[in-house]
A protein has these predicted regions:
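Conserved active-site alpha-helix within GNAT-family acetyltransferase domains
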Residues: 94, 118-144
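Conserved acetyl-CoA-binding loop-helix of GNAT-fold acetyltransferases
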Residues: 89-102, 126
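Conserved N-terminal entry element of GNAT/NAT acetyltransferase domains
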Residues: 1-14, 150-156
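A short helix-loop-beta-strand connector motif used in the catalytic cores of GNAT acetyltransferases and
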Residues: 44-60, 77
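A short, internal acetyl-CoA/4′-phosphopantetheine-binding micro-motif in the GNAT/acyltransferase core
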Residues: 78-88
Length: 156
């Protein structure tokens, strides 16, 4: 599925929040207890998303006028990559990651790190990320993954 990848705007916050919460409740809920999902969900209220928009570089994937994915870059750290549950497996996440990589390379960043959920571990591994270590926040298990960027082969 080809999407338009564009920078997120403040007026996208509600749609981004809905998308992330739907992905958490549908996809991530298969790998994490309900209490963890409820805790993580609080980080993505419309208000919280608006705050993130002022702190990070956030992009959205849009198809037919609808936001179907989001991802952000915080320096060299990839954060909050989510795709609408009904669009997962259609290349939306890969397109978002390609844009993050382009942005990182243009900023002189040569390595990306991602604190991955166990749900997304396979996705990142398929993009060439390798697991460095595990990290726990209470019951939430996160995998710290990393990938070297290559200026000549930056199309995922």
């Amino acid at each position: 599925m080809d999407c338009e990848i564009r920078p997120a705007h403040e007026q996208d916050a509600d749609a981004i929040s809905r998308l992330i919460i739907a992905a958490l409740q549908t996809s991530n809920a298969q790998d994490y207890p309900a209490a963890v999902i409820a805790q993580v969900r609080q980080n993505f209220s419309p208000h919280a998303v608006r705050q993130l928009l002022s702190k990070r570089q956030v992009w959205v994937a849009q198809a037919a006028g609808e936001i179907v994915g989001t991802a952000s870059l915080d320096g060299q750290v990839v954060r909050s990559v989510f795709v609408a549950p009904e669009r997962q497996g259609q290349g939306v996440g890969r397109q978002l990651m390609a844009e993050l990589e382009r942005q990182a390379l243009s900023a002189g960043i040569t390595q990306l790190t991602v604190p991955s959920s166990i749900t997304a571990e396979g996705f990142y591994a398929n993009l060439g990320f390798r697991t460095l270590r595990e990290q726990y926040h209470g019951e939430e298990r996160t995998l710290i993954m990393q990938r070297e960027l290559d200026q000549t082969t930056h199309n995922l």
